Amino acid sequence: MITFYDETGKGYGAQVELKTKNAVNGERSISGTIVSNKQVLSRLDRGWSFTFDGELYKIIYAKPKDEGKNISLSFDAVHQFFYDFEHSNCYKEFNGSNRFEVYIEEIFKNSGYRYVIEAEAKAIRKENFGNASRLKMFKEIIKAAGLEFSVTGKVVRIVKKVGTDLSTVVRKNFNMNELTIEKNIGNFITYKKGLGAWKDENNHD
């Protein structure tokens, strides 16, 4: 049983099958299938959250599945850090060469997260770098420095690179154009009750 929280903080328990994924560069994502609780099945939306192993995750994608008499809902979720940093901007703009620490300090300023740098990095030259999401800037400067990071709670550890680039899951799910719920889940539930059907399977508006 997992408790999902809507954006007002109200909780809803549901039976869920989970698959977790931890990869290089801090990725902590979870995929799952919800099989019970009509309130969750019909209302789950981007930004809902749940806790797993003491860490908070945010829903970024959901898709209902017709299983005959029943409906299940598959979803993807990412650690709160990725969600928060994608939805928060850093308005500072950099031009020229700066120490790695200067970039990191500005990216994390007033973010609610703190960082620990456990590796050395050379100065990095950037032009017109800034005025973007914290996540975009953070990923770019980490890549430029040749480092990696891991996330636990509200703490981000920046370490020497030992793995490879971000996984497909993170690259896909943090394209802002793809951060959407695939279908209108409420309408899907209505359809299953026999009250209507999609006119266009690819257009559920």
Segments from the language model and where they lie:
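Juxtamembrane "anchor/assembly" segments of surface/extracellular structural proteins
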Residues: 1-43, 80-82
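Envelope-exposed proteins and targeting segments
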Residues: 28, 55, 71-73, 154, ...
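Amphipathic, non-transmembrane alpha-helical segments in extracytoplasmic/periplasmic proteins
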Residues: 32, 77, 90-115, 128-153, ...
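Surface-exposed cap/loop segments at beta↔alpha junctions
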Residues: 35-115
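Short, charged/polar, Gly/Pro-enriched secondary-structure boundary elements
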Residues: 80-88, 163-172
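Surface-exposed aromatic
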Residues: 119-127
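Acidic/histidine-enriched alpha-helical segments
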Residues: 154-163
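Acidic, small/polar-enriched beta strand-loop surface segments
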Residues: 166-205
